From Swiss-Prot:
Listed name of the protein: FAD-dependent monooxygenase hkm7
Binding site for FAD: R191, I192, Y193, D261
Alphabetized SUPFAM superfamilies for the sequence: FAD-linked reductases, C-terminal domain (SSF54373), FAD/NAD(P)-binding domain (SSF51905), Thioredoxin-like (SSF52833)
Entry function: FAD-dependent monooxygenase; part of the gene cluster that mediates the biosynthesis of hancockiamides, an unusual new family of N-cinnamoylated piperazines. The NRPS hkm10 and the NmrA-like reductase hkm9 are proposed to convert two molecules of L-Phe to the intermediary piperazine called xenocockiamide A. Xenocockiamide A is then converted to hancockiamide D via a series of hydroxylations and O-methylations.
Annotated EC: 1.-.-.-
Pfam families on file: FAD_binding_3, Phe_hydrox_dim
UniProt keyword Oxidoreductase, yes or no: yes
Pathway(s) per entry: Secondary metabolite biosynthesis
Keywords assigned: FAD, Flavoprotein, Monooxygenase, Oxidoreductase
Family note: Belongs to the PheA/TfdB FAD monooxygenase family.
Originating organism: Aspergillus hancockii
């Protein structure tokens, strides 16, 4: 959702989605009784606006495509397939060379002989073509992992049930019968996942090619007995066997980048695939755009794999834990797994990601309260010092590759503190100007915690005004903390500090107002100076 907010589509997503507020576990005990065991509140952690929600992937794609066209005029072209991909390795060390050659052909015409083909030269290729990725195969990148034995059926239905928690996200599991997962969907739909080939007589030898919608519903009704399930309409159904696999690499010859299911495959039970794929793509996208436009140094592209591979590994670990929740026998093992659910909720929300030390993440710098390099910036509300309007920190960072430097100025009613802010601002103006056009990608914001009457807007440095006018100059970059944000984030009101925030809202560097040398070193190793 934080990524969607960057592109201004979060409102359209939340307008269509079904909020997922509670998660409920039912179990059948040894005596055969089915009963509710646990109920988990799915509340957003501190610094997060949204709880979880469910929305069909096709709808998300339509929202994204519409926004892409609005922003750039670019439209997604379908009915094509990749037939060849080569990399000129002699040119791959030249970052400006179009070292990739791709041949695509139209598949709109069923007649093979009539299919037209086209060869495209490109500097970079992104393989976002799914679990059966042609790009991955053509590059000879292997997938490593295991295939499970459980066969699952999945359906989107309109219907009703006397099962008490049919209206919530619910898991029904039995050591002997298998499991069912009910997930509420948009417009009254319910997604049903049903474990088909576990234990119950006659189901163990089930083959995927024999599965039908009627068979999935039969097994679902068997697992939730004595409760009934009535189905009015089946919108979609399928079946799957879980593969948990990870590609051996995510970057080939520094030119081909794999994202999403082309890198990691797992069960669809928690809806993590699309979310993680979008995060992969956004992580890569702003880096690639910055390099192509000459704003960022070329070596930052390597951080795509160093940052996202650990996330992919954690994704597979999480998937194993979720599957274990369905299969662990009642007792201590199941209780230990249930204790992991709160942490799983944080991870599934995408907020548990912390990137390690790299050219893009300076974790060795002095920390700033709870703001730690590598973690996502908390989304907190502060107030425009000129208008008093509330503003969220995440709303400042748009999906245009822009960076933010947030100066936590502390109590600037103290002259010594304001002097520190003035000195830092002069250094930042000098650095920004030395970067030329690349410096325009950095926006500066200030949050102080002084009382309203104690400081005038004109007392603040010109760095935080988006115009050079000195009379009637508009604001929009200077904010005041009225809701104990400093205290909540454990930032010193007396000392303040600085946080550099990347385009993906992860903190790149955090330290004190006087850590100017470290801050400048970081920016110079990331940004590439460009003449105006």
């Amino acid at each position: 959702m934080e990524i969607f907010e960057s592109f201004g589509i979060e409102g359209e997503v939340t307008k269509q989605w079904e909020p997922a507020t509670d998660e409920i576990l039912w179990c059948r005990n040894e005596s055969g009784t089915l009963s509710r065991m646990e109920r988990f509140r799915n509340e957003p952690p501190v610094g997060v606006k949204w709880t979880h929600g469910t929305l069909q992937q096709g709808r998300v794609e339509e929202i994204m495509k519409k926004r892409i066209t609005e922003i750039s005029g670019v439209e997604v072209e379908y009915s094509t397939e990749l037939s060849d991909l080569t990399i000129n390795t002699r040119e791959s060390s030249n970052s400006k060379a179009s070292a990739c050659s791709v041949t695509i052909r139209s598949v709109a015409d069923d007649q093979e002989a009539h299919r037209s083909s086209e060869t495209i030269r490109a500097r970079y290729i992104i393989g976002a073509d799914g679990g059966r990725s042609s790009i991955r195969d053509l590059m000879g990148v292997a997938m490593e992992g295991t295939k499970g034995t459980a066969i699952w059926g999945v359906m989107d239905i309109l219907g009703g049930s006397d099962f008490p928690d049919f209206g919530a996200t619910s898991v029904v599991r039995s050591d002997s019968d298998g499991a069912v997962d009910f997930v509420r969907r948009e417009e009254g739909l319910t997604r049903i996942y049903v474990e088909l080939n576990k234990c119950a007589a006659g189901w163990e030898a089930l083959e995927r090619d024999t599965i039908t919608p009627e068979l999935i519903l039969e097994k679902c009704r068997y697992i939730i007995r004595p409760y009934k399930l009535e189905v009015d309409y089946v919108e979609w159904w399928s079946s799957f066997t879980v593969w948990q696999r990870l590609s051996k690499s995510m970057i080939v010859h520094d030119r081909v980048f794999l994202v999403g299911d082309a890198v990691h495959t797992h069960s669809p039970l928690c809806g993590m695939g699309m979310n993680t794929g979008i995060q992969d793509s956004f992580n890569l996208g702003w880096k690639l755009a910055g390099v192509v436009q000459g704003q960022l140094n070329y070596d930052i592209l390597q951080t795509y794999e160093t940052e996202r591979r650990p996330v992919a590994e954690a994704l597979l670990d999480t998937d194993r834990t979720v599957l274990d929740l369905f299969h662990a026998p009642l007792g201590p093992e199941a209780e230990a797994l249930l204790a992991k659910v709160p942490a799983l909720q944080v991870y599934l929300g995408g907020r548990g990601i912390c990137y390690h030390e790299s050219v893009l993440t300076c974790r060795l710098a002095q920390t700033l309260g709870d703001l730690t390099a590598g973690e996502c910036l908390p989304d907190v509300t502060v107030f425009d010092y000129a208008t008093g309007r509330p503003s969220s920190t995440h709303s400042w960072i748009k999906g245009n590759g822009g960076w933010a430097i947030i100066v936590w100025a502390g109590d600037v009613s103290r002259p010594s503190q304001m002097n520190l802010v003035q000195s830092l601002s002069r250094d930042m103006i000098e650095l920004r100007d030395s970067l030329g056009k690349s410096g325009s990608m950095i926006d500066f914001f200030l949050i102080h915690c002084s009382a309203w009457p104690s400081v005038e807007l004109a007392d603040f440095p010109p760095l935080f005004f988006p115009t050079t006018k000195t009379i009637g100059r508009p604001n929009g970059r200077i904010f005041v903390d009225e809701k104990a944000v400093y205290d909540g984030l454990h930032i010193s009101r007396a000392e303040g500090g600085v946080a550099i925030v990347r385009p993906d809202k992860h903190i790149a560097w955090a330290g004190g107002l006087q850590e100017v040398d470290s801050l400048q070193r970081y920016l110079r190793q990331v940004f590439r100076p460009q003449p105006e």
